[in-house]
């Protein structure tokens, strides 16, 4: 990957305390354009706190947070969004009863006309939605159909397409495949691959090493609020990754005990 | 219907690759379908059973007057329901706003215009309080506004006794507002000249002296129609409309997408209370007095009209024009039965059945539309 510029997002020694609880204890990571960084870690490792910090939901207690080399201090999710960091949450992305178009433009409706008659240009919205869906290979017969009619994978793709359309430089995907079946998962993974080729940085959070290994360029493993290490794909096998993620030894012992089925 | 067909052809022009969506699917996707079908059913029923005078101009006005007063509440209740909340205090709010309005006019001798503005501001404030309590306590709005149903009704009684020295009715409002310039906007009939002209042209029934039998359209009907159009436009065409659907559909997803959910909901509560105040002002000016039973049980009727109009109880889905038709169904049945041989006490039976049917139908349609299983 030809990265002439530095990383888009770089965090160094991020610490976050919730009262007396230390959620993040000096986490460092970075992601560049055209790269998929996979964030792995068991429950309680600090993945969600790290995502919340990156997406402006919580503010770090200390540490350095650079976006394109400039130090930032986000006060709201909106501020992170404006800086080009878009987060797609696993189940809170779409409203099933609303149309695809209305979901796509939710919170960022393009306006037309003067103030008492100012309205949303839904004709334009429908065209854009149909076009964007077409690009990612989802055949939307009618952008006015409810999102509830789409499959889980398609919904994730719509949410990602929305973030891309609105100019995200970095996509944070919070377990986008955890609730999906096999076919749906491959659809989402394929789309993540497409997004990378467009030159966006992707931070992909998952439990599933197999999904991670399929698309990621690098892996950062979190454990108990700290970075356990960052590995390029060429430096690590899927088994090693699995062991690192689940705390190494224990799982290996368990695996042997179960006859190597995990 | 013509509008829908136009839309389809426009879409075909834009992109010929897209298969046209069948008219039936488009219709099914409209939340107000049930209400329109219901209204047709009701009208056919009365065509067959009622005295033909029901469908005269005078008969229609008799139906539309109560329908419009309920409808103003129902449209606001529909918007609030789409936004994901209920307001059970609107009926009591009508009584309380009526008291505030009456006291401002009589006890404080305010001008009509001033009294109207102050009553509206006061109602908006009370609505916003409702909203703030619901938002900050995260209690269901059902229970918070149920509390206000009793609080406001009780305050109305106490306030009326205080204002009148022991009575539960405040009279003499008519004399205070006789000469007010703004009276015509909130009271009586509108378009009187047009009706005189229509009578001259022999287009409508008239008395032997040449005056029309129906002197005009009650102003409440015009308010009702205007609000229905405005609310429909806001819902379907504006950013605020999208935010209302989003806030009711899934507040978390909406917030993550940058929708100010709390502001939207607070605004809707204030709007609902203002609609109650508007009904209070119109009915108090018409009656020339206000009493403690004003708006009694209107909260249920408004919610029923909204549900018949296609609103889901869980929020995020519904229509204002549906509530418009829901309110007209309500008015047609309550008044229409007096034109038939049936006992008009069948009204409530009919209403309950209608509500049950509407809810079943809405659920069915929602599953169809969203592919929910």
Ranges and model annotations:
Chain A
Residues 2-262:
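Glycine-rich phosphate-binding loops of nucleotide-dependent enzymes
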């Amino acid at each position: 990957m030809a990265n002439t510029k530095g990383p888009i997002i770089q965090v160094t020694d991020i610490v976050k305390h919730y009262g007396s609880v230390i959620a993040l204890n000096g986490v460092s990571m970075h992601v560049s354009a055209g790269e998929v960084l996979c964030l792995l870690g068991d429950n309680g490792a600090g993945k969600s706190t790290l995502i919340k910090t990156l997406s402006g939901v919580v503010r770090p207690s200390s540490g350095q947070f650079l976006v394109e080399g400039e130090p930032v201090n986000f006060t709201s999710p909106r501020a992170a969004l404006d800086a080009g960091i878009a987060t797609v949450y696993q189940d809170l992305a779409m409203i099933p009863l609303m149309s695809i178009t209305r979901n796509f433009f939710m919170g960022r409706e393009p306006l037309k006309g003067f103030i008492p008659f100012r309205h949303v240009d839904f004709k334009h919205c429908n065209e854009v939605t149909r076009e964007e869906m077409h690009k990612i290979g989802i055949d939307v017969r009618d952008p006015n159909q409810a999102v509830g009619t789409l499959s889980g994978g398609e919904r994730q793709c719509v949410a990602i397409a929305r973030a891309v359309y609105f100019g995200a430089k970095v996509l944070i995907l919070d377990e986008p495949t955890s609730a999906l079946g096999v076919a749906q998962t491959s659809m989402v993974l394929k789309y993540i691959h497409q997004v990378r080729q467009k030159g966006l940085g992707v931070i992909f959070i998952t439990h599933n090493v197999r999904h991670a290994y399929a698309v990621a360029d690098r892996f950062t493993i979190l454990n108990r609020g700290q970075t356990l290490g960052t590995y390029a794909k060429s430096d690590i096998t899927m088994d090693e990754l699995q062991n690192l993620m689940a705390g190494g030894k224990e799982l290996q012992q368990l695996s042997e005990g179960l006859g190597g089925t995990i | 219907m013509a509008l829908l067909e136009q839309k389809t052809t426009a879409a075909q022009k834009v992109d010929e690759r897209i298969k046209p969506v069948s008219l039936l699917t488009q219709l099914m996707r409209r939340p107000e379908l049930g209400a329109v079908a219901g209204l047709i059913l009701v009208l056919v029923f009365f065509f067959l059973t009622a005295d033909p005078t029901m469908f005269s101009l005078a008969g229609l006005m008799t139906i539309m007057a109560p329908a419009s007063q309920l409808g103003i509440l129902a449209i606001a209740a529909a918007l609030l329901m789409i936004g994901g909340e209920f307001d059970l205090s609107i009926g009591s709010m009508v009584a309380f706003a009526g008291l505030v309005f009456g006291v401002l006019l009589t006890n404080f001798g305010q001008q009509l215009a001033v009294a109207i503005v102050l009553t509206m501001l006061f109602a908006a404030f009370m609505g916003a309080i409702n909203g703030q309590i619901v938002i900050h306590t995260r209690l269901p709005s059902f229970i918070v506004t149920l509390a206000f149903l009793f609080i406001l009704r009780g305050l109305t009684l106490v306030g009326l006794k205080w204002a009148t020295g022991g009575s539960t009715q405040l009279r003499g409002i008519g004399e205070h507002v006789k000469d007010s310039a703004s009276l015509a906007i909130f009271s009586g009939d509108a378009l009187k000249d047009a009706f005189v002209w229509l009578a001259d042209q022999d287009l409508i029934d008239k008395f032997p002296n040449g005056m029309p039998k129906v002197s005009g359209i009650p102003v409440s009907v015009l308010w009702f129609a205007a609000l229905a159009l405005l609310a429909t436009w806001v819902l379907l065409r504006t950013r605020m409309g999208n935010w209302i659907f989003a806030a009711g559909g899934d507040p978390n997803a909406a917030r993550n997408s940058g929708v100010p959910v709390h502001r939207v909901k607070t605004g809707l509560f204030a709007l609902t209370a203002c609609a109650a105040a508007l009904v209070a002002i119109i009915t108090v000016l018409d009656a020339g007095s206000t009493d403690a039973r004003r708006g009694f049980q209107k909260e249920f009727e408004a919610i029923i009209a909204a549900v018949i109009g296609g609103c889901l109880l869980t929020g995020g889905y519904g229509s204002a024009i549906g509530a418009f038709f829901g309110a007209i169904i309500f008015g047609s049945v309550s008044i229409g039965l007096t034109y038939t041989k049936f006992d008009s006490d069948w009204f409530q039976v009919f209403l309950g059945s209608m509500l049950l049917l509407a809810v079943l139908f809405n659920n069915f349609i929602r599953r169809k539309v969203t592919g929910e299983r």
